[in-house]
Amino acid sequence: MLYTAEILTIGNELLTGRTVNTNASYIASRLTLMGFSVRRITAIRDELEEIASVIKEILGRSPAIVVVSGGLGPTYDDMTAEGIAKGLDRKLVMNEDALRELREKYQTRGLPLTQERLKMALLPEGAKPIRNEAGIAPGFTLNVNGTDIVATPGVPREMESVLESFLNHMLTRRPPVYYYEESFLVRGVMESTLAPHIKGIVKETGVYIKTHPKGHETSEPYLEVQIAYSGENPDRVKEIVRSVKERVKAVVRELGGTLDRVQNP
Amino acid sequence: MLYTAEILTIGNELLTGRTVNTNASYIASRLTLMGFSVRRITAIRDELEEIASVIKEILGRSPAIVVVSGGLGPTYDDMTAEGIAKGLDRKLVMNEDALRELREKYQTRGLPLTQERLKMALLPEGAKPIRNEAGIAPGFTLNVNGTDIVATPGVPREMESVLESFLNHMLTRRPPVYYYEESFLVRGVMESTLAPHIKGIVKETGVYIKTHPKGHETSEPYLEVQIAYSGENPDRVKEIVRSVKERVKAVVRELGGTLDRVQNP
């Protein structure tokens, strides 16, 4: 059974190109290493109807997990909790545990719980808050028809804190799958020359091989070759990746290429 | 009339988190500065059916432009042209102009046009190739029911070359809109304290204001305040952004905050 995942990142700054979406790649990498297959990453604006409708679309594809990032803060344009509630046809309610966390973070410093601060404890009905150790706004999770939805703040270190806490303690189903990859660099072989050989090895072994061009195809051919596989037995997965790597290296040598610095030998 | 845009980035490396999607932010920034409103950025795997189905979804939302990046190369997993053709119910055909470009790039160097190399000239029926000045695989464009689709390679400098060539010479409809933003940094005011004031100014002026937290809400409040607006008259747009900036700065001073280094005065 495939454990699929989707990532939804919310924030106008992603759509104007102001912010590079490093949250998406952090989350994708973390989920991949846990054995999830990330199928789609979507970035949308801070808009209520848009958030609600994309949440519905994603749930229609029934992933095992959806990680949502951004829009949990105190400002007028933070509307992820409300958007998720709307997408699920649930009410937005004051969550007592989240409220306790906010009280602790503001009131113990003598700061009043204004309307903007209280807003961060308004979660979709049935959601469980996830403590934010690196900032204020709590994350939250809820399971809908077998899909774990987890919402994290957009500030990177807060996203990481909430995501790790979720993955380590609250994940409903953990994939029984191990993912492994290795890469190496090749000089002097064009991507289009290596292509038919790689196609043959992929077809025969089922291992994923991708060439990432780094130089210029004809004038200065320089490629990174990535080999990735996943399976239940970590030792077996590593062994398969390494044996395929040796086969590709042998082909590169036959084609007159040279192996550059190996990144993860 | 709103000129909406979508971006579709294709490549397994984006979904495993191996590659940070800097192409998406480059394209988003370029389109935003031209006056487009980027509504959605999607990243998916190199999978034929997935590409075809996402292309259909995007066209169903009728954006003015869709920029697709990645998957135009010579390898077995480069299948963007075929996926777009399938999504449009068009045939994939050998394009004579693209073939001429490949002949020039390979045969003039004494390199044969193998099957893998010829594949890069197979484009959806009716597509116009866009010369790739920075690499081999040509980009292409086609207009479907008023939506400009433009496909670029995934290697960043090749994407930039093809995209610029498209935007400067082949774009069907150019938005008559100018976008402008300024930012400044604030110390000593919590985001939740500034929030109600900003909400009021946004409501009154229609100007977009976003606070980006950079420090820690209660222990070391530090915010970047971004002010953005767009309209037909560049001078008027700048004037509005600057006057709103002064209003927000005045509020910050009243709240006891200090203005840090101004980024674009």
UniProtKB/Swiss-Prot annotation, chains A, B:
Task: Kindly give the InterPro entries that the UniProt entry links to this protein.
Answer: CinA, CinA_Arc, MoaB/Mog-like_dom_sf, MoaB/Mog_dom
Q: Which domain of life is it from?
A: Archaea
HAMAP family annotated for this entry? CinA_A
Q: Which NCBIfam families match?
A: PRK01215.1
Membership in a protein family: Belongs to the CinA family.
Which PANTHER family does the entry mention?
NICOTINAMIDE-NUCLEOTIDE AMIDOHYDROLASE PNCC, NMN AMIDOHYDROLASE-LIKE PROTEIN YFAY
Name-wise, this protein is Protein Msed_2121
Which classification does the entry list for the species?
Answer: Archaea, Thermoproteota, Thermoprotei, Sulfolobales, Sulfolobaceae
